[in-house]
């Protein structure tokens, strides 16, 4: 984003008061509209824009705006939460990305205030992108910084009735072992309640978490898969197969010993599950 637009954002935020949320949100929108690409630039398909109420402003621009908002908001978290709510609720995909990014420093400054707020925002996600941006920008920072204090709080999120709350938690839990390998076994245990979830968005997050666990402690992941090797639940089998099919190639050799597990699943699988299992077996045999 240009220095001129950055200065515009700073000016808008410097004048912000909680009683003027609508004006501030509108002024921020006018700034990101200036960075909107030409219609011919295929950054996001028209159908997706309509579904997400998206204009098509590039994500790096939106994140730059959000970071500037966050610099001021971290010093006045309570005052800025109404603006975050309005951006999330009323300003489409662009507003949600700006809000999620701004919440990053706000959460680090006031986690007890921001974490419950983020949970409620997650409930109203429109897409997996909303949910994942919120998880990684607005929830993950404090969990990664102080897992001994904040990780356990996500257990209830994993069991929430709302699929986006579940996905946000599983995403954050799953990413922790990337930097803190000693938490891998615990993180896998925490996502276990979502393993057989019927919703594909949740299952994809669980598969992602298993793959990220492989970066922290592959042995813990092997133990986790073996633990569920007797499951006949198609949802569980799909997750375990997707984890192998989508695993980073350099980690796959550490899971070849699990080939008999997948071969047994293939022997008893229904027709719907066979394709997933065959894909996992193919990946493990390479």
What are the roles of these predicted feature ranges?
Residues 1-286:
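Alpha-helical scaffold domains
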């Amino acid at each position: 984003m240009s220095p001129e637009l950055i200065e515009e954002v700073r000016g808008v935020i410097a004048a912000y008061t909680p009683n003027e949320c609508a004006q501030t949100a509108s002024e921020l929108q006018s700034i990101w509209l200036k960075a909107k690409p030409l219609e011919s630039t295929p950054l996001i398909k028209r159908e997706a824009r309509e579904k997400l109420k998206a204009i098509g402003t590039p994500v790096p621009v939106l994140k730059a705006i959000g970071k500037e908002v966050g610099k001021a908001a971290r010093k006045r978290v309570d005052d800025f939460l109404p603006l975050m709510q309005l951006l999330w609720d009323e300003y489409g995909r662009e507003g949600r990305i700006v809000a999620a990014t701004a919440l990053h420093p706000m959460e680090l400054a006031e986690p007890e205030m921001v974490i419950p707020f983020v949970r409620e925002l997650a409930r109203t996600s429109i897409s997996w992108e909303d949910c994942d941006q919120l998880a990684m920008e607005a929830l993950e920072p404090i969990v990664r910084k102080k897992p001994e204090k904040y990780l356990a709080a996500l257990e209830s999120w994993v069991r929430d009735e709302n699929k986006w709350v579940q996905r946000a938690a599983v995403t954050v839990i799953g990413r922790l072992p990337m930097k803190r390998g000693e938490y891998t076994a615990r993180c896998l245990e925490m996502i276990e309640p979502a393993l057989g979830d019927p919703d594909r968005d949740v299952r994809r997050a669980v598969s992602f978490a298993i793959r990220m666990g492989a970066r922290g402690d592959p042995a813990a992941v092997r133990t986790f898969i073996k633990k569920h090797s007797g499951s006949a639940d198609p949802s569980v089998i799909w997750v375990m197969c997707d984890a192998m099919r989508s695993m980073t190639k350099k980690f796959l050799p550490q899971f070849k010993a699990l080939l008999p597990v997948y071969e047994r699943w293939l022997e008893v699988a229904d027709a719907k599950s066979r394709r997933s299992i065959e894909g996992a077996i193919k990946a493990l045999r390479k």
